[in-house]
Amino acid sequence: FLRQFAKALIEFIDEQGIRDKVMFHTSDEPSTENYFKYRKSAKIMKELFGEFKLIDALSSFRFFKNGLVQNPVPCINDIEDFAGKVPELWTYYCCYPHKDNMPNRFIGMPSLRNRVLGFIVYKYDVRGFLQWGLNFYNTQYSKEHINPFELTDAGGKFPAGDSFVLY
């Protein structure tokens, strides 16, 4: 099924003329415990979509060093491990780098923590920013749908402001 789907998807992408805007990813922050499963999945993704940009949010340099991902996207608190070592540095932030004065967009954070992102992007010559929480109006694991005007923390699982930007 996956090969048939990939073929049809690539045809659609080409018909729409958006090939240069499309990226694919294998997994979100694979852990070192999942290394061998990730390696198998990444190989399949490379076979199916290798002509596209393949990116993955991951913070273990080992995955990139061993050729499992072309474009790693480390969490902002791990950016120094990747700076100067990857061809095109991207980064992201999400619910867990809320300590150590790292930037993020949580509702309860001082505004400076939002604005320092520009300095970090400049300092490390970051070329892309992966934004996951655009419109995730669900509880963790998508078990329930939420009203973003009444509940801002994904059912108490994420810091308020992490799971969506659009209201």
Language model regions located:
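Catalytic-core regions of glycoside hydrolase
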Residues: 1-143
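Predominantly late transmembrane helices and immediately cytosolic-facing juxtamembrane segments
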Residues: 136-167
